[in-house]
Amino acid sequence: MTNICIIATIIIYLVAMLLVGFAYSKSNNDSTDFYLGGRKMGPLVTAMSAEASDMSSWLLMGMPGLAYLTGIASPGWTAIGLALGTWLNWLIVARRLRRYSANLEAITVPQFLSLRFHDQRNLLNALGAVIIIVFFVPYTASGFAACGKLFHSLFGVDYMAAMVVSACVIVGYTITGGFRAVTTTDLIQSIVMSLALVAVLVYGIGAAGGWDAVVANAQSLPGYLTMLASHNAAEGTATSYSLLDIVSTMAWGLGYFGMPHILLRFMAIEDEKKLVLSRRIASVWVVIAMTASIIIGMVGLGMTKAGALEYLSGSSSETVIVRIANLIAQHGILAAVLAGLILAGILAATMSTADSQMLAAASSVSQNILQEFGHMKLTERQSLFAARLTIICVSVVGVVLARDPNSSVFGIVSFAWAGFGGAYGAVMLCALFWKRCNWQGALAGMLVGGLMVFVWKYLVSPLGGVFGIYELLPAFLISLLVCVVVSLVTPAPSKEIEAEFEAAK
């Protein structure tokens, strides 16, 4: 009966998401409607959609799992960097990008860069689209992996089968409803995610013997409850957390300036004046959600100490919320329904990011590669068909990449996040705030930044020491340097480009 209630709750939730997609299916009259919702998004939907699409499955799986194993330092500094990055992105990028993109009538991030620099060859369009596809596919795969882990660990359902079903639901409402469906479901999913965090915290603290017991257990573990050390569970010792480690984890915040699926939310709000309210909502929610996520990891370890939860090692630590939900479900029908909502919250975290990523990838192929770079003359209907076909292809490749049940959600997200921050972050800031920047500098910055993520991750980082820093930081800085240097040694932008820049201030 317990499993039936949980499964029924999850099915109802998934069907509701599909119905949202179908409800908006007839409102997509053109590409602007499908990709940006006609630039008619309200402040609440804009804020919560941006943050729900940002906080993927790592919020309810990766971050609690990291806190469970290593303590609060690594997830804590990461959360601080992300909170600062979120706030700065809303503060300095959102308004300028909304105004500039509307002036240029750009509906995708690569298209904005191409129009911003009057890139006649559409090289920025093509490179930007390729970068989005290269890094969004593994990012999407991490979401599918989270879905597979969820159902496999709870019901013993085949990992691959769970991924395929989850992918079909996400693809279903994304290809039918477009941006409006994605943002509306994101709002719903952010609420479900919040309820899941609260429910798990309340139950977990009680099962661990109370808050004092949770804290006492954390204090007894070397390096667990300090921001200057990391707990080594295997050896029962503390590892010093250096300044390099702090800078490396906080560097996550730089990624926000280059996240296409988040930047699209800024471009879609109905009135730039409402961005202030959106910023406040988004910033507060992010801080609360990440704090709760880290505490859940600590509470989960407290439950292990109390004998309420088995010890979770390696990537299985990412299922701590799933295990707690399973314990909640054993307390009756209503508790099982609540457990179903908690698990739906994990699905929500995954779906709210995956749908946005697939939509961004779809716009890159249909709008940026086929029409603008490839000069294909597509009708609105053909363009939307190409976009929907891209969504299906991305999901198929994502499922294939995530076929390993032992893959780390946090690890996959970390690399993809670095890719976007390194390739897009510095270039986007230069495009918005530096008038002397030109298309040559932007192109070089994107190319070098994207490549540097791979070079640093696989060639430089293994050297250890100072080179072990998170690849996003060196990629971002080198991209910025290359963008500035190349712009300065090549011809200055035309008077027309400078006039457009001034008009967007």
Where is each model-derived feature located?
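Membrane-embedded helix-loop-helix hairpins and adjacent transmembrane boundary segments
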Residues: M1-K505
